[in-house]
Amino acid sequence: MKKGYLITIALLCLIFTSNAQEENTNASNFGLKGGYNLAAVSFDGEEETGQRHSFHVGIYGESFVSKAVALQLELQYSQQGYQVKSNGGTFTQKLDYINIPLLFKMYPEDSFYLEVGPQAGFAISHKETFDSSFNLFDTSQEFEPNKLDWGINFGGGFKTNNGVSLGVRYHLGLGDIYEDQGSPRNRVWQFSIGFDL
């Protein structure tokens, strides 16, 4: 008898879960997001430069494939780069990108999510500034970045029922910023707030 009750309860739970997933399968959100960047560059996968403080802003589309799983595509303008200090002087390179992250999101709880996914970035501008006392390397050399950057994002955050989200993300760059200069790669922390429209 108990076994029959357990089977019945299990079937009801399965049906309820399936219905809940179907209700959320076609759910989608579109919104705006922006926030604060802490950007640096890693050389040879070890030594990391000082951080550049900057920002990012963009749009996103989030589509649920089940109650707890969603895909999110973003189009983002991101100010990145790095700082190097030596002998009282500072060298700063400002690198501006248009980034396109594609994120696999999981919601283990209703308002909490984890995310991971690839990102492609396109360098659109760069600018170098330095003090006259800076002499760690030759500042007259060319600092033209590669047009294409790519890597992986990891992150998490909270999203309320009314569509406001707070998130933290780490971008692990896997493509070299320059050619033949010690494998410099982007390392960026992003702290963002988003709003569904």
Indicate residue ranges for each PLM-predicted region.
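Repeated loop/turn-to-beta-strand initiation elements of outer-membrane beta-barrel proteins
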Residues: 68-71, 111-114, 162-168
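Outer-membrane beta-barrel translocator domains and adjoining extracellular loop/strand segments
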Residues: 42-48, 83-90, 127-134, 178-183
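Membrane-embedded beta-strand positions of outer-membrane beta-barrel proteins
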Residues: 32-34, 73-75, 102, 116, ...
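Outer-membrane beta-barrel "beta-signal"
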Residues: 37, 113, 155-165, 185-197
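Cleavable N-terminal export/targeting peptides
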Residues: 1-26
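Transmembrane beta-strands of outer-membrane beta-barrel pores
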Residues: 36-40, 77-81, 120-124, 170-174, ...
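Residues that define the transmembrane beta-barrel architecture of outer-membrane proteins
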Residues: 26-28, 49-55, 94-98, 148-152, ...
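Outer-membrane beta-barrel strand-turn architecture
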Residues: 24, 63-67, 106-110, 160-162, ...
